[in-house]
């Protein structure tokens, strides 16, 4: 080979080039060292071609271009006559990527970050990028207080210029805050100020929010909390002068010192509004009214700005700008607030689109909209659409996005982004109690049938005492105006004596149809007709049953009886919950009732009222107080009694947890000669007492009251991804059932007064709900702490497909 003349000294990573002051014509280009990169690809990345006249600048540009591809660790350009010889050393190819020792950061998150930096299997390894990644990961650990953490990239060579990449983590322990000092505070004590921080130097056992583990982001949030605390109390000149974070020599302890200047308290002297108010000055002025002498309050100023933006948003001004500038008068310690408003352009809606509704049809979502296409944009109407979609219960999350139309100064598209949840549920329930043993129930419910919004349910129960089946269908939009139509048919064969109720058998079947009429956004009225046939048999004489039979003109010794009833059913629902399942804010009231109409054998009425109110106690709605009540009352008409099988019952997972289902309230008092189970061992014996025999068999009552107070908390050990699917709560339940027609003189002296509503049962416990693929799962454990003779405890209860 002819002697090669070195043209240019090494450039970048000890690269060598040719030297040629006058340049030469390239007749050929040869490569040495290519393995994975094709010759054609390398040639395309070079600015030099065969036939070009090149000089030292062209050669330098060639080297830079080859390095820029990211495929090479070293590049040398040499001349052999008129041939350009390019010697390269390819970067190794990553064959595999593994992680070791990472506990705080998941593998998937690490892979995403590596891929974002171009580090992935099959790509070339850039050692410079790798060093940046090591430093970035260590900085992350430092930001969460793990100052002893280290991250090292271990590169293991493999044949064919490949490498295995392994990131080895030494996470260490989080540095704990030893002390937080605030210097310069005079108006408030350090303890008072720190009590509002997330970071603490001392955390009581009951404080589930406070944290001694240092995190840079939490400190920034706490400093902002400190600033807001002072600004909300009139300290308009408040300033955080400096913050020092000191680390102990072993890197396990943190000392934080915050130096502040409080300044004086200032009062608002007035608010002046200017700018483009879009003709809504009077409404904006109402939002800026202040009380004379009111202390300056930063949070109220921010709220005022937001209220002005919301007001303008209702009129189609989608992107208003509102800026408040306080003018501080140090002489008289007052602040004049100058508010500049720029309403901007007014927009109308070109299209409303939906994303994420893979099952639900667009029409099901679109009919819930209050914002119309082609109309001026109204932020309140867009929000109403979001609320209505949430209340459907079909979606885990609903978000809105107002997007400008490219090229248009006054058009936007409104996009509703939904995440669907499983609206079908397999209803399976199981309960266990010390006295009740095991009980089961099953059913299937689909609240969004084939994405149409129809609700279809098939429910059934089969056990020792009941065979029940029901088919129900509801069309929520029977008319375009939102009138709903629902109906059901059912069959029930109920052996009450095997269910720890008073002794009788009832075979019933029936049907009903109901129309629902929306009154406004939150109120719906319902009306319908129903028919039910009841055939009673095997009735053992007891006082409550005798009262009913006698009112129907039947003998007290009657053992069988049949009745056909037609009812007018009615109801009212007020629903202002923020979403259909796992609500966190708002309230719901449901009133239902029925009354028999002419042609019925029975004459009676029943009415029930259910209420639920959710009150969030934090901005993220993770801590929520829930109050619920259930009331019921019924009675006979025209001298007749309400049928005993229509009585109200309490106890169980849907009313008072910790008690066996339906066992709270009046118990059967059997008459002399009745053959029933009444003694303490549940042995079947004849009642031989002239005045009657008391029992533990529940008969229910014509009046009921149930209340519950529940504290909903974040579920421990559940990631943010599943936070909307799991709910934990601590509860206190109470309830009672009574019989307003009970006559104590008709029963033995040792029988309680069942007309007394003061016989209240109470329990407390913990519940866990999970929206599983099978439907909602509900676990509860409750301990009754106020009960009466004859009550049956059932501490643990488990249901699939049922919540209350």
Curated annotation (Swiss-Prot):
GO terms for cellular component: Bam protein complex. Residues 1-20 form the signal peptide. The keyword NAD does not apply. The keyword Signal applies. It is found in: Cell outer membrane. GO terms for biological process: Gram-negative-bacterium-type cell outer membrane assembly; protein insertion into membrane. Disulfide bonds: none annotated. Keywords: Cell outer membrane, Membrane, Repeat, Signal, Transmembrane, Transmembrane beta strand. Residues 24-91, 92-172, 175-263, 266-344, 347-421 form the POTRA domain. InterPro entries: Bac_surfAg_D15, BamA/TamA_POTRA, D15-like, OM_assembly_BamA, POTRA. Gene3D superfamilies: membrane protein fhac (3.10.20.310), membrane protein fhac: a member of the omp85/tpsb transporter family (2.40.160.50). Its main location: membrane. HAMAP family: OM_assembly_BamA (MF_01430). Part of the outer membrane protein assembly complex, which is involved in assembly and insertion of beta-barrel proteins into the outer membrane. Constitutes, with BamD, the core component of the assembly machinery. Part of the Bam complex, which is composed of the outer membrane protein BamA, and four lipoproteins BamB, BamC, BamD and BamE. This is Outer membrane protein assembly factor BamA. It comes from Salmonella paratyphi B (strain ATCC BAA-1250 / SPB7). The lineage of its organism: Bacteria, Pseudomonadati, Pseudomonadota, Gammaproteobacteria, Enterobacterales. The gene is bamA.
């Amino acid at each position: 080979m002819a002697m090669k003349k070195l043209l240019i000294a090494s450039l970048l990573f000890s690269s060598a080039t040719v030297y040629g002051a006058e340049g030469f014509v390239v007749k050929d280009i040869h490569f040495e060292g290519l393995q994975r990169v094709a010759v054609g690809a390398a040639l395309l990345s070079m600015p030099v071609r065969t036939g070009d006249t090149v000089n030292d600048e062209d050669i330098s540009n060639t080297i830079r271009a080859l390095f820029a591809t990211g495929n090479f660790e070293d590049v040398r350009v040499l001349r052999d006559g008129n041939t350009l010889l390019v010697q390269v050393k390819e970067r190794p190819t990553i064959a595999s990527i593994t992680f070791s020792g990472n506990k705080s950061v998941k593998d998937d998150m690490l892979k995403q970050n590596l891929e974002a930096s171009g580090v992935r299997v099959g790509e070339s390894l850039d050692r410079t990028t790798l060093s940046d990644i090591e430093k970035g990961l260590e900085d992350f650990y430092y930001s969460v207080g793990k100052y002893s953490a280290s991250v090292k990239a271990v590169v293991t060579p493999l044949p064919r210029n490949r490498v295995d990449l392994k990131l080895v983590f030494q996470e260490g322990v989080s540095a704990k805050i030893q002390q937080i000092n605030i210097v310069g505070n005079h108006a408030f004590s350090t303890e008072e100020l720190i009590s509002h921080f997330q970071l603490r130097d001392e955390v009581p056992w009951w404080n589930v929010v406070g944290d001694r583990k240092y995190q840079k982001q939490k400190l920034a949030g706490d400093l902002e909390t400190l600033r807001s605390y002072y600004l909300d109390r009139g300290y308009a000149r408040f300033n955080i002068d400096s913050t020092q974070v000191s680390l102990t020599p072993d890197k396990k302890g943190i000392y934080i010192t915050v130096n502040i200047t409080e300044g004086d308290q200032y009062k608002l002297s007035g608010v002046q509004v200017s700018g483009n108010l879009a003709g809504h000055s009077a409404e904006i002025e109402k939002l800026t009214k202040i009380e004379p002498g009111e202390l300056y309050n930063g949070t109220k100023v921010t709220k005022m700005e937001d209220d002005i933006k919301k007001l303008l948003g209702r009129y189609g001004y989608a992107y208003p700008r509102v800026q408040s500038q306080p003018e501080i008068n140090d002489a008289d310690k007052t602040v004049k607030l100058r508010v500049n408003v720029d309403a901007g352009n007014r927009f109308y809606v070109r299209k409303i689109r939906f994303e994420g509704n893979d099952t639900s049809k667009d029409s099901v979502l679109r009919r819930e909209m209050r914002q119309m296409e082609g109309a001026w944009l109204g932020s309140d109407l867009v929000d109403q659409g979001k609320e209505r979609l949430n209340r459907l219960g079909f979606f885990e999350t609903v978000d809105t996005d107002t997007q400008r139309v490219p090229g248009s100064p006054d058009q936007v598209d409104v996009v509703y982004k939904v995440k669907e949840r499983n609206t079908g549920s397999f209803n399976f329930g199981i309960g266990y109690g010390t006295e009740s043993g095991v009980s089961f129930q099953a059913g299937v419910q689909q609240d969004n049938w084939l994405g149409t919004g129809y609700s279809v349910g098939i429910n059934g129960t089969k056990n020792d005492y009941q065979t029940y089946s029901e088919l129900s269908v509801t069309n929520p939009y029977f008319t375009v105006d939102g009138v709903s139509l629902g109906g059901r048919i059912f069959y029930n064969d109920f052996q009450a004596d095997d269910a720890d109720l008073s002794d009788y058998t009832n075979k019933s079947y029936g049907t009903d149809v109901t129309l629902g009429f929306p009154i406004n956004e939150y109120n719906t009225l319902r009306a319908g007709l129903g028919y039910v046939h009841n055939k009673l048999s095997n009735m053992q004489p007891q006082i409550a049953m005798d009262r009913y039979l006698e009112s129907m003109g039947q003998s007290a010794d009657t053992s069988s009886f049949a009745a056909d009833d037609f009812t007018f059913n009615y109801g009212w629902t007020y629903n202002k919950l923020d979403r259909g399942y796992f609500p966190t804010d708002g309230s719901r009231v449901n009133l239902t009732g029925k009354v028999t109409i002419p042609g019925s054998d029975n004459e009676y009425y029943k009415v029930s009222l259910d209420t639920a109110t959710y009150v969030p106690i934090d901005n993220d709605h993770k801590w929520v107080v829930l109050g619920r009540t259930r009331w019921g009352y019924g009675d006979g008409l025209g001298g007749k009694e309400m049928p005993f099988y229509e009585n109200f019952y309490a106890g169980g997972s849907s009313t008072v947890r910790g008690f066996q289902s339906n066992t709270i309230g009046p118990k059967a008092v059997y008459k002399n000669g009745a053959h029933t189970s009444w003694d303490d061992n549940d042995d079947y014996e004849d009642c031989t007492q002239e005045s009657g025999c008391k029992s533990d068999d529940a008969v229910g009552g014509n009046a009921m009251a149930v209340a519950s107070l529940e504290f909903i908390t974040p579920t421990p050990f559940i990631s943010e991804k599943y936070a909307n699917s799991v709910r934990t709560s601590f509860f206190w339940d109470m309830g009672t059932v009574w019989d307003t027609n009970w006559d104590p003189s008709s029963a033995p002296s040792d029988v309680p007064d069942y007309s007394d509503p003061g016989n209240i049962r109470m329990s407390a416990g913990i519940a866990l709900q999970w929206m599983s693929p099978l439907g909602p799962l509900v676990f509860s454990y409750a301990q009754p702490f106020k009960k009466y003779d004859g009550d049956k405890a059932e501490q643990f209860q488990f249901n699939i497909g049922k919540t209350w």
